[in-house]
């Protein structure tokens, strides 16, 4: 068998994939099909921007804020110079509120996702359910 024949046989198994003007991959190969399915999954994630998901994220933010506030109350409340001033407490309140919002926004707790899945009427049945 000559080298050109071997190379042409090897190239037959490589799917032809092209990029469309929108940036999506098009082609007949299984990779393109899997990528398309993943993009459709991302589109499902995009629907989470609806009102229910927004409310679920706000609930998670509130939960984290209450948890952080409870943890903060365990601190003594004194600094090296004595009691904290009003402005110091105000600054700390804003700081901890920001921490709570950032913790919830990163989704580390996953509460918003769970609440959204429980309350979303369009959700699909879980495998094995």
Swiss-Prot record:
Q: Which domain of life is it from?
A: Bacteria
Protein name according to UniProt? Uncharacterized protein TP_0959
Annotated source species:
Treponema pallidum (strain Nichols)
